[in-house]
Amino acid sequence: MKRYIVLTLMLLTLHAGTLLAQSAQPREKSEVEVFMQQVAKAVAKSNEIDYAYISTSMFKQLLSQFLTMVNDSIEIHDQVEQIFGSAMYMRRFISTGIEGYKVLEVAMHPFWGFLEEKEEVMGMELCALNRENGVVSIIYGNSDSVLVINNNSNALNYNIVFVAGLSYEAFMELDKSGIDLGF
């Protein structure tokens, strides 16, 4: 009897050890997970984000959604639509500096002059240009960031979203998943 108890305990220990070893293996973090870590660090540091042109309220909303998911024990994975419920509209920027703000100011010019010569803003190429029902949507992007500019034919009424740390491809996956991006 004693032998069976010892054997059972040994088997349980081996099984538990195997499970622990498998769960301890590091897995590659998705692009969205890395982005959300940056969000958490930035929000914890300050109310002002010092490395991206993006509203504090948007960061806080993203972080709130992320924490809700963790609390609900939903597994975080590559499905970006689970982290981003919607793209918020922005009219102001938290700027890293006057030079960066000037670049964005050029991009927001009411005559869209930046489209005539160089179709690039802040190192991001023009990826999509659409005009529908009087709303002009312009999307710039690269492998690191996305800039969305919406204009509803009123030079003073811009909706702008800049997302640092999320590629254009990952950002556009939101649209494919049926989520309304607001443009």
Segments predicted by a language model, with ranges:
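Long, charged/polar, surface-exposed segments that mediate recognition or autoinhibition
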Residues: 84-129
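Bacterial Sec-dependent N-terminal signal peptides
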Residues: 1-28
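Early exported N-terminus immediately downstream of N-terminal targeting peptides
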Residues: 25-99
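Polar/charged side chains located within well-ordered beta-strands of beta-rich proteins
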Residues: 8, 15, 91-92, 148-150, ...
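A short, solvent-exposed beta-edge/loop patch
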Residues: 137-171
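Short, low-complexity, Pro/Ser/Thr/Gly-rich segments in the mature regions of secreted, periplasmic
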Residues: 169-183
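Acidic, glycine-rich flexible loop segments
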Residues: 120-145
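Hydrophobic, Leu/Ile/Phe/Ala-enriched alpha-helical segments that form helix-helix packing faces
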Residues: 39-43, 111, 115-119, 178
